[in-house]
A protein has these predicted regions:
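H-loop/switch region of ABC-family ATPase nucleotide-binding domains
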Residues: 102-103
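Catalytic Walker B motif of ABC-type/P-loop ATPase nucleotide-binding domains
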Residues: 66-69
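A short, proline-enriched helix->beta-strand linker immediately N-terminal to the Walker B motif
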Residues: 59-64
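A short, surface-exposed alpha-helical micro-motif characterized by mixed small hydrophobic
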Residues: 108-110
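Helix N-cap at the start of a conserved alpha-helix in ABC-type nucleotide-binding domains
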Residues: 77-79
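Conserved ABC nucleotide-binding domain
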Residues: 26-43
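Helical segment within the ABC ATPase nucleotide-binding domain
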Residues: 81-93
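Conserved beta-strand-loop-alpha-helix hinge in the C-terminal portion
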Residues: 122-146
Length: 153
């Protein structure tokens, strides 16, 4: 978890105590106990722990743009909420331009400042500002159902 990349090839640790302390501090903010698992292989972590760690790792270096593709899809509802709260916090703190792909209509309405619905490569809904704020889940679902009926689904 903490810079283990070179260990497989017999290389020494690529980190120092200050960096490990920084990782521990960042991971502690998640509230998932990951700060005590720096020696654990990533593959043995739960799906939620891996998603939280991946999100944190992807935003530790200076970036301006973040792409999230169904980053809560395989998680249980409680962990998905935690990941969304963490995502919202990181995006706001770092002022990141973010594209989040989701099929969770509540997340589509609740998060972000613009909502776009795509169908076969075309934009069929684009709402921002007050118009997005006033958009309901039912409105999005109605549009989705209309598209599904047109496609024969």
């Amino acid at each position: 978890l903490a810079d283990n990349k070179g260990r497989f090839y017999g290389l020494g640790r690529g980190t120092n105590k200050a960096r490990i302390d920084y990782y521990r501090e960042q991971l502690a903010q998640l509230g998932l106990g990951l700060e005590d698992k720096l020696h654990v292989k990533v593959g043995s972590l739960s799906g939620g722990q891996r998603q939280a760690m991946a999100l944190l790792m992807s935003t530790m270096t200076p970036i301006e743009f973040l792409i999230l593709d169904e980053h809560t899809a395989a998680l249980d509802p409680k962990t998905a909420e935690l990941i969304m709260e963490l995502t919202d916090k990181i995006v706001k703190e770092k002022n990141l331009t973010t594209v989040m792909v989701t099929h969770n209509l509540r997340y589509a309405v609740e998060y972000g400042n613009r909502l776009i619905m795509m169908h076969q490569g075309h934009c069929v809904m684009d709402k921002a500002g007050k118009e997005k704020e006033d958009t309901s889940i039912d409105e999005i679902l109605t549009m989705f159902n209309e598209i599904s009926i047109e496609c024969g689904n």
